[in-house]
C-alpha cells in the first residue's frame, strides 16, 4: 500500500474516532488508532492532526470532556476540490460575491484573478471567507455570475 493510501486511511479512521466522541486524551486516541492497525502513530502525530482538522475538546452527552470535530468542517484539506470550498455565490447590480469555507477565500480568489479580463473579471478582493468580484465594462454582472457558477459547478 502506498504512503498516500495509508495517509488517507489514517485520516478516515482519525475522523471516525473523533466522531465517536469518547476519547478525552491524545493518549486514548493513539491507543485507538494503534488498535485499528496504525502501529507507527504517536502522540505528537495525533496532536498535529487535531490541530490540522480543527478538533476541539467539548462535553459529550455524558458530560465528559472529549475531542471532537467542529460542526463546520470547512477546513480545506489537500484533497479538497475548490468547488467543495464554495458555500454560496450571489450577485447584485455591481458585484458577484462568493462565500467560502473559513480560510478558503484567498485560494479561490487567486484562481479567479488568474482568469483575468479575458473572462470578464476586472478585479477580485478576498477576505477570510468572502470574495468580491468586479466585472469588466464589457460584461454584465449577471453574465459574470453565470460564468462563475459554471466554473464551480454551482447551481442556483
From Swiss-Prot:
Origin: domain of life: Bacteria
Protein name listed in UniProt: Arginine repressor
Gene giving rise to this polypeptide: argR
Pathway(s) served: Amino-acid biosynthesis; L-arginine biosynthesis [regulation]
Taxonomy of the source species: Bacteria, Pseudomonadati, Pseudomonadota, Gammaproteobacteria, Vibrionales
GO biological process: L-arginine biosynthetic process; protein complex oligomerization; regulation of arginine biosynthetic process
GO MF, one example: DNA binding
PANTHER family: ARGININE REPRESSOR (PTHR34471:SF1)
Alphabetic keyword roster: Amino-acid biosynthesis, Arginine biosynthesis, Cytoplasm, DNA-binding, Repressor, Transcription, Transcription regulation
Described function: Regulates arginine biosynthesis genes.
InterPro entries: Arg_repress, Arg_repress_C, Arg_repress_C_sf, Arg_repress_DNA-bd, WH-like_DNA-bd_sf, WH_DNA-bd_sf
Entry's localization field: Cytoplasm
Short name of any one Pfam family annotated for the protein: Arg_repressor
Organism of this sequence: Aliivibrio fischeri (strain ATCC 700601 / ES114) (Vibrio fischeri)
GO CC terms: cytoplasm
Presence of the UniProt keyword Lyase in the record: no
Family: Belongs to the ArgR family.
Gene3D superfamilies documented for this protein: 3.30.1360.40, Winged helix-like DNA-binding domain superfamily/Winged helix DNA-binding domain
Amino acid at each position: 500500500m502506498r504512503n498516500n493510501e495509508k495517509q488517507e486511511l489514517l485520516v478516515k479512521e482519525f475522523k471516525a474516532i473523533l466522531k465517536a466522541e469518547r476519547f478525552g486524551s491524545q493518549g486514548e486516541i493513539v491507543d485507538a488508532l494503534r488498535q485499528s492497525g496504525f502501529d507507527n502513530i504517536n502522540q505528537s502525530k495525533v496532536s498535529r492532526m487535531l490541530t490540522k482538522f480543527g478538533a476541539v475538546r467539548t462535553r459529550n452527552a455524558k458530560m465528559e470532556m472529549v475531542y471532537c470535530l467542529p460542526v463546520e468542517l470547512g477546513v480545506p484539506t489537500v484533497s479538497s476540490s475548490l468547488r467543495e470550498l464554495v458555500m454560496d455565490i450571489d450577485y447584485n447590480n455591481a458585484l458577484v460575491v462568493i462565500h467560502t469555507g473559513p480560510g478558503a477565500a484567498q485560494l479561490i480568489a487567486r484562481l479567479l484573478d488568474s482568469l483575468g479580463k479575458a473572462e470578464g473579471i476586472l478585479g477580485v478582493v478576498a477576505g477570510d471567507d468572502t470574495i468580491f468580484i468586479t466585472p469588466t465594462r464589457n460584461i454584465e454582472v449577471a453574465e459574470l455570475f453565470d460564468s462563475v457558477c459554471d466554473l464551480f459547478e454551482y447551481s442556483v
